[in-house]
Amino acid sequence: MRQCSRRIFLECGLGACAASTLIPPLSARQTMPYYKAVFDERFEDARAFAGQATARATPTVAIRGDVTNLFFNDLDARWKLGPVWLIGFTTSASLFCLHLLARDRGMRLRFCRTNPNKKAVEGVLDGALPLDAVKVPVAPGDPSDLVLWVLAPSARASAKEIANG
């Protein structure tokens, strides 16, 4: 059996120590840092979504189909500082308006699913975004169909560009 030199031993030891600092422990991983969880309070499933978001320490904001007050009293000022992660469980009409406003601020629709099941809602709240293609509902079918969505900063957007733009 060949002996290991001190030099090789030290290099391997230092390499292992350096690698361990690059890999965060499982307990250090955080849930998705959503700025707000938007929900349409007219629907029971959306209210349940708000309860789940609150349990995960995500601030919630209720709407009743119209996003005007939310935009002018909250999101407009926040988006001037830079794009943020936003999650919602609303009608497709509400998503349509928020998506257009968010696009102008360097954000994009990252996830969108119509009438998701409870497991999918919990997964997205915990930060698990499926890699399937984003399909924006073009024309609303049933007005009571709810859409679970995530708006996120686009790859090209930076907080400096948004603040100066």
Residue positions per predicted region:
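Extracytoplasmic/lumenal soluble domains of exported proteins with redox or metal-associated functions
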Residues: 27-165
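N-terminal secretory signal peptides and thylakoid transit peptides that target proteins
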Residues: 1-17
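N-terminal low-complexity, intrinsically disordered segments
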Residues: 20-24
